[in-house]
Amino acid sequence: MRKLAIIGASGHGRVVADIARRIGYCEIVFFDDDESIHECGGYPVIGKSSEVGTIDADVIIGIGNAGVRKQIQESLPDEKLVTLIHPDAVVAEDVVIGKGTVVMAGAVINPGVRIGKGC
C-alpha cells in the first residue's frame, strides 16, 4: 500500500492530495503546525510538520508559499521526498524534475526542461 504524508493542510495541500489519489496513493495523511486543523479534504491531520519523520511514508510538501516550502524541504531527508505528476499533465520524455516537485493538471513541460527540487 502506498502511503503519502503531506505537510500543509490547506487549499494547496488538498490539490496535492487529489493528485496523489489519482496516481495511486491509497493512504494519505496530513501534518500541519496549526493544532486546530484535524482534517483536510477528508484526510486526517495526524501531527505537526516536525513529526513527519515518525511514520513510514513518502513525503511531499503541500504549501503554496515557495519560501516556506523551500525551508521545510531543506530540513527533510531526500530519500523520503517524492515527485507527483498529475495524469493530465504533459511531460516530455527527457524532462528532469527534482524531488519534492508537484506538476499540476494541465501543465505542459516541453523537451529539455529541468525543474529543480520542491517546485
Residue ranges and their predicted role:
Residues 36-92:
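Phosphate-bearing ligand-interacting subdomains
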Residues 13, 37, 47, 64, ...:
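Glycine-centered flexibility motif
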Residues 24-26, 55, 80, 96, ...:
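Short loop/turn motifs at secondary-structure junctions
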Residues 83-119:
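Structural signal for interior beta-strand "rungs" in well-ordered beta-sheet cores
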Residues 2-61:
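A solvent-exposed beta-alpha-beta segment
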Residues 7, 26-30, 79-81, 102, ...:
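Broad hydrophobic/π-residue packing in well-ordered secondary structure
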